[in-house]
């Protein structure tokens, strides 16, 4: 057993209001640069829908993640080394700019410089890649916001598999949920395995997956290999970039920017201890529906004396073990079984987990629109189909989803009896196997969600690292070229990258 630590995240979809604050703050901090205009390390999708980039969950098309061979070994879905190298100069499974969207801005300067005319001057959209005027904006980073567009296009959502999706196109049966997405920082990352340059690595101390910008040669195999499509190609620098889990903040014991600025308090950060030697066998599980439980088996109890002893021997600091014992991620994933992984069938063992949404369910239950199954309402007839959530979070296995939903309903039933009726009613808790102490703690973490409860991040031990003070307020991702550009000779053809076009001051001559 080799014990390692990882900073994981849980997102409570029951409380997400779809405000996109996380996306905007992440964009302003990390991807507001030339070449990354189209990239969103964090985005919030409306489900059902094909998402961003288009149809990212269709692995038959994009070949992301892992597959299990007949002999029980894992192999990237894109192919073995020979097949991967055979596609290195022409990858047919690579998303194009149209699968994301062509980034654009508006020539606002025209509003000030337009000559006098009988028509109101307007700011026309222009491409941030070519600088040319765009006749029509056909896509964007949030094109399906709040079920935008016709159901025929949204029905291509891969999570409708094994469902009669036609009925959900009717207005009476419409449902919606928000899904914030970022890099999963997987335990078994396919992007690391598919990079020909060996530029992607997973940090031992906190599990964050990063791309070495000096080693990256822009082959873009990692974009295909990542089943979540959370790696982006910077057309300015010629290198791939991805969510870095705000590791400078994590090292200082602070939460990520998306977590810090979340309006709904839906994000939780905490340390998980895991057995690194068990990753291969867990990811190689034959039945996809067993992958969720096998990943749970990889995680270790931070309160177990034997685990603590072995962790210290393996170099895990005591402060990290102490943080793991207070981790909200461990409580929600292991103790209460509320948090579930996103598409475990990709076999990457993702480390950003989700609590399934309950809000529309609760309103229907309160109105008496749901049948009752004992004390709790019948969660098999909810507005958001359980099978849809299962396809999204547990490879189609409905039992973990049902347990999570029932436990959240039971906690609400218990607290309502306590605060409204003034009595203790534990019947709902007994039905789902929860104690009163667990229900009270769940209420504190889910409803109150204090800062110190949501974020338990130990500062890193980098006593021997060089002083980073000279880098403060500097320009990142410029490869030593100062703050005036990102030109670099670190590319295949040793050529100068094109400059981005400033479209805000570019105007058309008037007739």
State where each predicted segment sits.
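Non-ligating segments of multi-cofactor redox enzymes
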Residues: 1-511
């Amino acid at each position: 057993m080799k014990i390692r630590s990882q900073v994981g995240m849980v997102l409570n979809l029951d409380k997400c209001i779809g405000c996109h604050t996380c996306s905007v703050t992440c964009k302003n901090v990390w991807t507001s640069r030339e070449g990354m205009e189209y990239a969103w390390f964090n985005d919030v999708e409306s489900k059902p829908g094909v998402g961003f980039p288009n149809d990212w969950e269709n692995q038959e098309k994009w070949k992301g993640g892992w597959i299990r061979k007949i002999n029980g070994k894992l192999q990237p879905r894109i192919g073995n080394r020979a097949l991967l190298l055979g596609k290195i100069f022409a990858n047919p499974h690579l998303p194009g700019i149209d699968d994301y969207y062509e980034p654009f801005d508006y020539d606002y300067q025209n509003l000030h410089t337009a000559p006098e005319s009988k028509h109101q001057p307007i700011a026309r959209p222009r491409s941030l890649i070519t600088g040319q005027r765009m006749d029509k904006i056909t896509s964007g980073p949030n094109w399906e916001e709040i079920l935008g567009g016709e159901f025929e296009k949204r029905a291509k959502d891969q999570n409708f598999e094994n469902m009669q999706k036609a009925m959900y196109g009717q207005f009476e049966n419409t449902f919606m949920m928000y899904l914030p997405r970022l890099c999963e920082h997987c335990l078994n990352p396919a992007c690391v395995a598919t990079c020909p340059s060996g530029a992607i690595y997973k940090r031992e101390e906190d599990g964050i997956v990063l791309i070495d910008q000096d080693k990256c040669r822009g082959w873009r195999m990692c974009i295909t290999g990542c089943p979540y499509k959370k790696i982006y190609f910077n057309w300015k620098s010629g290198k791939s970039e991805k969510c870095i889990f705000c590791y400078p903040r994590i090292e200082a014991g602070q939460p990520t920017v998306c977590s810090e600025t979340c309006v709904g308090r839906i994000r939780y950060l905490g340390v998980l201890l895991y057995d690194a030697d068990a990753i291969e066998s867990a990811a190689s599980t034959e039945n996809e529906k067993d992958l969720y439980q096998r990943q749970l088996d990889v995680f270790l109890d931070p309160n177990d004396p034997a685990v603590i002893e072995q962790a210290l021997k393996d170099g895990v600091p005591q402060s990290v073990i102490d943080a793991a014992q207070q981790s909200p991620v461990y409580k929600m994933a292991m103790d209460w079984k509320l948090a579930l992984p996103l598409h475990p069938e990709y076999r990457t063992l993702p480390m950003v987990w989700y609590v399934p949404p309950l809000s529309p369910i609760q309103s229907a239950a309160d109105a008496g629109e749901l049948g009752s199954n004992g004390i709790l309402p019948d969660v098999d007839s909810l507005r958001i189909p359980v099978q849809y959530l299962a396809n999204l979070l547990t490879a189609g296995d409905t039992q973990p989803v049902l347990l999570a939903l029932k436990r959240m309903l039971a906690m609400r039933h218990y607290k309502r009896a306590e605060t409204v009726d003034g009595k203790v009613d534990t019947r709902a808790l007994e039905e789902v196997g929860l104690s009163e102490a667990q229900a009270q703690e769940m209420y504190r973490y889910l409803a109150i969600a204090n800062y110190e409860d949501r974020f338990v991040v130990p500062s890193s031990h980098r006593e021997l690292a060089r002083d980073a003070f000279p880098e403060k307020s500097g320009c990142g991702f410029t490869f030593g070229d100062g703050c005036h550009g990102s030109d670099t000779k670190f590319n295949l053809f040793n050529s100068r990258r094109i400059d981005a076009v400033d479209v805000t001051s570019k105007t058309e001559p008037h007739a």
